[in-house]
Curated annotation (Swiss-Prot):
It catalyses: 4-imidazolone-5-propanoate + H2O = N-formimidoyl-L-glutamate. InterPro entries: Amidohydro-rel, HutI, Metal-dep_hydrolase_composite, Metal_Hydrolase. It is found in: Cytoplasm. This is Imidazolonepropionase. It comes from Paenarthrobacter aurescens (strain TC1). The keyword Transmembrane helix does not apply. Pfam families: Amidohydro_1. Keywords: Cytoplasm, Histidine metabolism, Hydrolase, Iron, Metal-binding, Zinc. The keyword Coiled coil does not apply.
Length: 409
């Protein structure tokens, strides 16, 4: 997902420019200038400077591009039979991961690359401009390394998820040793993050702690799948290891909420200054597909926890890349305001990936908000305001998309 462009572009007559900057500005009759890959200026249309190219937004809304901080794009096959069984009343368990692992191992590098590339294109066509993807359907050294290498060529952020499930026939402790040793070494050149599925039927608290400790010692940022199927140790582990995010968070005790809120006590939401805490990443499309309770996004926000929304595209529990669907669900079912939901799907995702601030972090500009110096990732709607995302559920409202200053839709 890379492109360059050195010309300047001026977009005027923006009906609503939802910046998602630290001031939460929403500008009316606005304009924005893109130079190369960065935002060079934004303000009122009447004050707009000249540029090489001029685009009239005709009153449409412009948002930051979606930042999808949780997906599983490196896979082959599907699990429609599992979905149908679940809709008929069977409960979700993590066992279907093994089905996808077999299908993924069976395809060539070229075919797996094509599949990932097609999924990225689908996401971009709906306004996603920054994408994370995990490994986790290889589950041996060779195939996890292959998944990481392919993902690194196609998405913005790669997360190592060898600790997704213990493969059939493997000893859990021996497999955890593999995840913490040779498999970790094999993926390191391609990944920035490590994750663990800390849940019944997957990895125990002690096994998860070993995985997180090994990944931290290897210099990787940390993420946790936790509290999806019931209350458990996932949130506490994420807090203990200062993980960037804990994802799913469907079942939270009061203690879990307080612990997450405590990680944000030293961070100023008005300026972004101070020590960041652990983001709670909500995955509403997954919750609907698995018929789990929706994550308590409203409660988390009210407690002072920063949240993200992500699509969790995967073949078993959330086969969608539609961030707009997640925003709609957050507004209609999770009781977030439109502004809160859009912020969680843009700035919140950037926060969960450590890409929310600074103009040069590992060679990447800040994403998830619209401000001078940030990467020019824009999502223009076929509507005058972001409210239409929830007001008109299911309607494809993406009009135009710019990624790193290049118009891609």
């Amino acid at each position: 997902m890379s492109a360059t462009n050195s010309a300047s572009t001026l977009i005027t007559n923006i009906g609503e420019l939802m910046t998602q900057d630290m001031e939460h500005r929403v500008l009316k009759d606005a304009a924005i200038v893109i130079e190369g890959e960065r935002i060079a200026w934004l303000g009122s249309t009447k004050d707009a400077p000249a540029a090489d190219e001029n685009i009239d937004a005709q009153g449409r809304a412009v948002l930051p591009g979606w930042v999808d901080s949780h997906s599983h794009l490196v896979f082959a096959g599907d699990r429609t039979a599992e979905f149908e069984a679940r809709m008929a009343g069977e409960s979700y368990s993590a066992g279907g991961i093994a089905v996808t692992t077999g299908a993924t191992r069976s395809v060539s590098d070229d075919e797996l690359t094509r599949l990932v590339r097609d999924r990225v294109a689908e996401a971009v066509s709906q306004g996603t401009t920054y994408l994370e993807s995990k490994t986790g359907y290889g589950l041996d050294v060779e195939n996890e390394a292959r998944s990481a290498r392919i993902a690194a060529a196609e998405v913005d952020e790669v997360t190592y998820l060898g600790a997704h499930l213990v493969p059939d026939g493997s000893d859990p402790e021996e497999y955890t040793d593999l995840v913490c040793g040779p498999m970790l070494d094999a993926v390191l050149p391609h990944v920035r993050w490590a994750d663990v599925f800390c849940e019944r039927g997957a990895f125990t608290e002690d096994q998860s702690r070993r995985v997180l400790r090994a990944a931290r010692d290897a210099g990787l940022g940390l993420r946790v799948h936790g509290n999806q199927l019931g209350e458990g140790p996932g949130v506490a582990l994420a807090v203990e290891f200062a993980a960037a995010s804990v994802d799913h968070v469907n079942y939270l005790s009061d203690k879990d909420v307080l612990a997450l809120a405590g990680t944000w006590a030293g961070w100023d939401p008005a300026t972004g200054a101070g020590t960041k805490g652990t983001v709670a990443t909500c995955l509403p499309a997954c919750d609907l597909s698995t018929r789990q309770p929706l994550a308590p996004g409203r409660e988390l926000i009210d407690a002072g926890v920063q949240i993200a929304l992500a699509a969790n595209c995967n073949p078993g529990t959330s086969y969608t890349s539609s961030m707009a669907f997640c925003v709609t669900t957050a507004v209609l079912q999770m009781h977030l305001s439109v502004h809160e939901a859009v912020r969680a799907a843009t700035y919140g995702g950037a926060l969960a990936l450590g890409r929310e601030s600074g103009n040069d972090v590992d060679g990447e500009r800040a994403v998830g908000s619209l401000a001078v110096g940030h990467r020019a990732d824009l999502h223009m709607l076929k509507a005058p305001s972001a409210t239409h995302l929830a007001y008109r559920p299911g309607i494809p409202l993406t009009g135009s998309v710019w990624r790193a200053g290049v118009r891609v839709v």
